Each structure stands twice: as C-alpha cells, then as structure tokens.
Amino acid sequence: PVTIRESVEGLLRVVNSYYSNKIEGNLTKPSELIALVDDSTEHKSKGLLEIKRHIEVQVKLNFENNPREDVAKQDFIKAIHKAFYAECTPDELLVSSSDNAKFYEIEPGEYRATGVVVGQHRPPKPDLVPTYMSWFASAYKIEYLHGLSKYYAMAASHHRLAWIHPFLDGNGRVTRLFTD
C-alpha cells in the first residue's frame, strides 16, 4: 500500500510542477492536471506535456541514486536540464531572440553559447558561465555546510543559479528543480 508520505510527495510533485510551469507562462488548468495524473488524456497540450516532463524529472531526481554531495556540481545541474528537455521535439527546442529576429536551438544539458537578457538582468557572458558554475559548485558543496548554514545556502544557491542563467532556456525550471 502507498504510505501517507508517498501520497503527499506525489501530490507535492504535481503542485510544484504546476506552479513552476505557471511562472513560465504555462496556462494549464488544475482540472487538466487531474487528467494528466490519471493518464486519461490522449491528446496532451504543449503545456500539459511540459508539466508531465517536469514531474518525470522530479521523480527521476528523487529515485535515482544521486549522492547528496553532488547536488551543486556542474554535471548534476546539467543533468537536470538534459532530463527536462530530453523528450522534446526539434520544434520545442527552438527559442527566439527577444525581437524574434533570430532563432536558437536549446542543447539539452549544455550551457548557452550566446548572451541573453532576462528583464533588466544581463547574466554573465557565455564564455564565463563554466567559470561561474565551477565557483557555484565549490561555494555550495554540501559537506562544507552545517546547521542553519545549509538553509541559508539553499536560498542563496537558488538565487545565484538563477542569476548565472547558465542555459539558453529552462533556467527557472532547472533552478526550481535543483532547489526541490
């Protein structure tokens, strides 16, 4: 039988995915999510498929044997990104520049090769991303964190990963999956 903990974890996965994707502009309604969870929808919308991928990555991260000390490492963060985009069609891997003048292809699990602007924020240039991510991995090594500092580091690492914006697209989702 399913334990209460397993039931709550499953529910929280759906809720976290719903809000994480809503932040990104996904307009899926909660009633559609129920159909997704029941797997009773044959023709899934793009938004529903995004949420489904998000939940699948959450499950994968939860049940794979990921050593805790690896969570801030570049390979782990790249693996989150790769897992989220692994099942995308070629069309779903295209993003346009802010002026729609140019299209770029998302490379799952790879750092961006072009500069980006996020609102008023200009993340580090692409050639500096590996350096920033190397710093990130060493600054947030879990074995160096004790007591309450783990919680402060969790919040700070969430902010810092979003600030670095290492990928062409999916940074918000990757950051929230990382923090989850």
Positions of the model-derived regions?
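FIC/Doc superfamily catalytic core
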Residues: 1-180
